[in-house]
């Protein structure tokens, strides 16, 4: 009888230990851990019921102190392992909740980033719209900065007016290339003698090889928004999309620096 009781108890303890040793499969299978937890808790209750049944059947009749101590030790071990599994599952559950909380904060972080970079987003949107508008006429629009695109957009608006009015520059007269500008507040205009271009090339200088000496200048400024702007001179024909740096030939008595400055005044002239 004692042998049968010991075998039955050993089998019971082994089943409980096997249940308690069930491998939780991590955060991705939290539901499986909960199922394991349910089984362990149920097994623990079954263990108590089984112990009570064995008591009724005369478990107290066991006289061996050694056997009694071994049985109690095994039961304590089962309870300890079950308790440890409960703590492990609960800890992983808290970890899952914590990670879920972190994921819940992601939209807030995205909103913060979007707010901080709102100016960049607006700039990208404006640039994209201008590139789409200007690409038909300027195949290099995609490579230009937003500031350059804005200038081209303004020029296109003026060009449309010039074409409608039939305005076209002429190099036959000293002032034939100049546009009539209505005076505005703060307007600065160079003296008239500097605003008239030389007609013809009689007074221009040539190199030893017979080629005409040319000058060009890069004129840049910052507008009210801090954007860089470069002075480009459009073609005398408003239907063309050519833009060049202020350039021209050297006149007699001029060096490259003086010739370049004169061209800027002649072709720019108004500030």
UniProtKB/Swiss-Prot annotation:
Short sequence motif Nudix box: positions: 248-269
Function: Effector that enhances P.infestans colonization of Nicotiana benthamiana leaves.
Positions of disulphide bridges: none
Membership in a protein family: In the N-terminal section; belongs to the RxLR effector family.
Induction description: Expression is induced during host plant infection.
Enzyme class name: hydrolase
Species name: Phytophthora infestans (strain T30-4) (Potato late blight agent)
Domain Nudix hydrolase: 212-271
Main location: secreted
Pfam families assigned to the protein according to its UniProt record, in alphabetical order: NUDIX
Annotated protein name in UniProt: RxLR effector protein PITG_15679
Range of residues in the leader sequence: 1-18
Enzyme Commission code: 3.6.1.-
Domain text: The RxLR-dEER motif acts to carry the protein into the host cell cytoplasm through binding to cell surface phosphatidylinositol-3-phosphate.
Short sequence motif RxLR-dEER: positions: 49-69
Compartments where located: Secreted; Host cytoplasm; Host nucleus
